[in-house]
Amino acid sequence: MNNYLRKLVEGQHLTEEEMYKAGLLLLNENILESEIAAFLVLLKAKGETAEEIYGLVRALREKALPFSNHIQGAMDNCGTGGDGAQTFNISTTSAFVLAGAGVKVAKHGNRAVSSKTGSADLLEELGVNISSTPNEIDYLLEHVGIAFLFAPAMHPALRRIMKIRKELNVPTIFNLIGPLTNPVNLETQFVGIYKRDMLLPVAQVLQKLGRKQSLVVNGSGFLDEASLQGENHVVLLKDNEIVEMSIDPEKYGFSRVKNEEIRGGNSKENAKITLGVLSGEKSVYRDTVLFNAGLALFANGKTETIEEGIKLAAYSIDSGKALAKLNLLIAASNEKLERVN
């Protein structure tokens, strides 16, 4: 590890292979916590490259719980966190809208790290059992169409690093790579990131991971979601080509909404917001979800255009299909799925 720390101190980038090996060292129980903290802080200070991100993702996916590869067509819509905006759980609420529209959603998430309420906190409050094994997750994806992958359970080797991240209390490379370490073999992905200068590197990593189609967004105000506040910077990965673009919500019929207007709270408050959206209540929360879910449906290839994606998202909610997916997940995740273990 000393060699890698020395390179980072000197401001040198690590190669993909060096980062892969450093990642394996970070997960080794014999490494000192001070070394882990130093590595994360030095890497953040230098700035992460696509090669470094992919190298670490390789190491983490290699050490994650094993999944079968028979699940086809799965998608994740996960933000990196780290934007400090304290918004409600936009991507988690949107996940049920995607599932209601017929997308198979493998939602990878965690408890709150830099926010008040993480996806795991919200889902627990709603009644979802977040403690699912890989076999149970496969079952839920096949029979319910949506499953939650609790990141600490999927990546047991990360327990020490999670503790150190909490103590550091600053965004690190792990905020960037969370959405990229989903152990399910995804075909498509919608990723929100808080760092605009990382749009292209993250898209390049998704390309290396073999995604058929993906959208990476940095929202107005540097939100890690698509924002109704103003222009959103986006990178589209399609047909193995990467295209940079900007998206204005007003073009799609949305009124401007400041990011402060969609702040969330604790898990109970955010659960109320999510249930309101999925029940069809008109609000700025609904519009934000429609925008994000519409973009995700476009990223998935479920629709040919963003406009069609937004319309399909609205249908998923207003038909009751999105809320039905939540209720199905609550019921199925709490069953003893002994038949699949």
Swiss-Prot record:
- Entry-linked InterPro entries: Anthranilate_Pribosyl_Tfrase, Glycosyl_Trfase_fam3, Glycosyl_Trfase_fam3_N_dom, Glycosyl_Trfase_fam3_N_dom_sf, Nuc_phospho_transferase
Pathway involvement? Amino-acid biosynthesis; L-tryptophan biosynthesis; L-tryptophan from chorismate: step 2/5
Task: Kindly report, in one word, the top-level EC class recorded for this enzyme.
Answer: transferase
Q: What are the binding positions for Mg(2+) 1 in this chain? A: 91, 225
Binding-site residues, anthranilate 1: 79, 110
Q: Give its E.C. classification number.
A: 2.4.2.18
Q: Detail which positions bind 5-phospho-alpha-D-ribose 1-diphosphate.
A: 79, 82-83, 87, 89-92, 107-115, 119
Annotated residues that bind Mg(2+) 2 are located at 224-225
Q: Name one GO cellular component term.
A: cytosol
Tell me the cofactor note: Binds 2 magnesium ions per monomer.
Q: Name one Pfam family in it.
A: Glycos_transf_3
Give the GO biological process terms. L-tryptophan biosynthetic process
A GO molecular function for this record? Answer: magnesium ion binding
Q: Which UniProt keywords apply?
A: Amino-acid biosynthesis, Aromatic amino acid biosynthesis, Glycosyltransferase, Magnesium, Metal-binding, Transferase, Tryptophan biosynthesis
Q: Which cofactor does it need?
A: Mg(2+)
Binding-site positions, anthranilate 2: 165
Q: Which domain of life is it from?
A: Bacteria
Recorded catalytic activity of this chain's protein: N-(5-phospho-beta-D-ribosyl)anthranilate + diphosphate = 5-phospho-alpha-D-ribose 1-diphosphate + anthranilate
Stated family: Belongs to the anthranilate phosphoribosyltransferase family.
Q: How does it assemble?
A: Homodimer.
What does this protein do, in the record's words?
Answer: Catalyzes the transfer of the phosphoribosyl group of 5-phosphorylribose-1-pyrophosphate (PRPP) to anthranilate to yield N-(5'-phosphoribosyl)-anthranilate (PRA).
Kindly give the HAMAP family that the UniProt entry links to this protein: TrpD
**In its UniProt entry, what is this protein called?**
Anthranilate phosphoribosyltransferase
What species was this sequence derived from? Bacillus cereus (strain ATCC 10987 / NRS 248)
State the gene name recorded for this protein: trpD
